[in-house]
């Protein structure tokens, strides 16, 4: 009997007439509540079972979810996309979750369908707040939290990524020769946005290499906050652009003092991970100049808000870091390698990093575990191709060991910090999104 019923279910067909309409007593569309052009249909052998047949791009029980929407207009009251985390990366609760059913806005309201609420956890704005939101579980309570989805009006790119000083973000003078296993030494012309940050030493001795960074505008370098947490004074550091060899003069290099050092106000560290690991350095030469474009000095493009390259994409990492954790000395030449982005689901597996990973981080690794960012690479760039141009997707942050199996490098996810960057840099010329 069970086998017969299962076979019958498999053979159930939606029957339509020659004009595309459903037959066999198909119900009025109002009985299904289909939206966005969805059609209410019934099955050949189970005519009382009704559902919405959704047009392409639309999903959900009532075709109420628009999978193509990645941003919102106005205050987002009409947003029907699939964003489902708050601004800190915490997952939203489903609108039909038991705890949410006790809240004013839930999937069981009579007007739930018109408000976009249903058997899902996607962000909505049913009560006309400033932007889409959701309920988030924090401890034992549920809170209303704004969502990690951006305003469409802020996502429009400028017609050109060339600023008034002649920079063109993401442009290289040389074509790299990718060699994944172990990486390869490279000229800075392959990574002209790379910034070498040195810590000054007492007694007049030469400064020591501290961390990498990335030139995101003529006057600003992005790096990792953990590089500076022990000595957070700007006077302790000097920055070089256009440098292929550490502590050596390079033709075309420029030296800068740090005019301003900004660490993320919510930076913290635990037993393994760094959180909100991002810093900004405002740079000036001794004569008050910002960076000048050349073959060896160029800005890197910033990603669109909350947008990253697909998982599995090849990305470049660059730095003066150690080649293995056991090395005593750092290499003197700039080195570049290629790694692949690892999905959050994979990186959150217990045998990877588990709960140490959140949605403000990116993971990347060599599939053969032979290449990785290592000690000394901190603050340097993870460059991925987004919409056809090299983009600063990540900042080298932390990881367990170097090229250790199932322990990818972890990077600050730049696309989730653009509002923070812009709030400090303001209308600075040359910031290329």
Swiss-Prot record:
Name the residues that span the membrane.
none
A GO BP entry is: negative regulation of plasminogen activation
User: In Gene Ontology terms, what is one molecular function of this protein?
Assistant: serine-type endopeptidase activity
Q: Name the segments for region: Connecting peptide.
A: 153-179
Superkingdom: Eukaryota
Instruction: Please give the residue ranges the record annotates as the region Binds urokinase plasminogen activator surface receptor.
Output: 35-58
Phosphoserine PTM positions read 159
**Xref: InterPro entries:** EGF-like_dom, Kringle, Kringle-like, Kringle_CS, Kringle_sf, Peptidase_S1_PA, Peptidase_S1_PA_chymotrypsin, Peptidase_S1A
- Peptidase S1 domain mapped to chain residues: 180-426
Q: Which CDD domains has this protein been placed in?
A: KR (cd00108), Tryp_SPc (cd00190)
Active site positions? 226 (charge relay system), 277 (charge relay system), 378 (charge relay system)
Biological role stated in the UniProt entry: Specifically cleaves the zymogen plasminogen to form the active enzyme plasmin.
Please name every pair of cysteines joined by a disulfide bond in this record.
32-40, 34-52, 54-63, 71-152, 92-134, 123-147, 169-301, 211-227, 219-290, 315-384, 347-363, 374-402
- Ranges for domain EGF-like come to 28-64
EC supergroup of this enzyme: hydrolase
Origin species, per record, is Mus musculus
Annotated signal sequence range: 1-20
* UniProt EC number: 3.4.21.73
List the catalysed reactions.
Answer: Specific cleavage of Arg-|-Val bond in plasminogen to form plasmin
Q: Name one GO cellular component term.
A: serine-type endopeptidase complex
State the similarity comment.
Belongs to the peptidase S1 family.
For this UniProt record, give its keywords in alphabetical order, as a comma-separated list: Disulfide bond, EGF-like domain, Hydrolase, Kringle, Phosphoprotein, Plasminogen activation, Protease, Secreted, Serine protease, Signal, Zymogen
Domain named Kringle is located at 71-152
Q: How is it modified after translation?
A: Produced as an inactive single-chain protein (pro-uPA or sc-uPA), is processed into the active disulfide-linked two-chain form of PLAU/uPA by a proteolytic event mediated, at least, by TMPRSS4.
Q: What is this protein called?
A: Urokinase-type plasminogen activator
Describe the protein's quaternary organization and the partners it interacts with. Found in high and low molecular mass forms. Each consists of two chains, A and B. The high molecular mass form contains a long chain A which is cleaved to yield a short chain A. Forms heterodimer with SERPINA5. Binds LRP1B; binding is followed by internalization and degradation. Interacts with MRC2. Interacts with PLAUR. In complex with SERPINE1, interacts with PLAUR/uPAR. Interacts with SORL1 and LRP1, either alone or in complex with SERPINE1; these interactions are abolished in the presence of LRPAP1/RAP. The ternary complex composed of PLAUR-PLAU-PAI1 also interacts with SORLA.
Control of this protein's activity is summarized as: Inhibited by SERPINA5. Inhibited by SERPINE1.
